[in-house]
């Protein structure tokens, strides 16, 4: 940590730490919310497709929102977008604790997905990526991804313990309120955004998208991430309930999700560090 601190100006260093905490909170409980699937579906008499559809919409909107939020943040500042996302996500999760109509519950996936997408680490990168050196950006991205994975590692067991001790209704409201912890952290990110900016914007958002998708390598990378995300989201959604169906304790399902996050931490650090030294295409192929 001391070596990392020496590599950055103080304002940027604290912004990186704040950004990692934002990533930890925003991804942690949203990625592990599937531990609520079985108890909620059983108590409310729903088929699992209700909960699954809501999570599917959440994942879709999370992906769609991030580039739009990043583009807006690039022009108007990351702190506004992150604040909106934190509040919107908190509202979405709170609604899940009080809306017991199947259709309305499914629709909360839109609110939560937009909120978590707007307060995800890529939005923080919009601010930090302009004030760190180009060679440091790979490391910062790896660090932020590792923080998100750490959130998943902690979120699933914590949520499961809360469900067992205070019930899923109260646990949901604690999850919702955790997103409000993001708001005071935005002070540090806004300070970094005020540092001298070496990044020059030469194209608008539409042009940037056209340029990106005209590149074969980017298109292949895009669909590679799509396939990866599809499989991981499927596992995140259904693994905890499946493990309980097989007669194991709920905490076993939670720790199964947590292990995915744990090993992703190591992978994120390793890929972020390696990306500063070795060829990124070769690393992706390996």
Spans of model-derived segments:
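Cytoplasmic helix-loop-helix junction between adjacent transmembrane helices
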Residues: 109-146
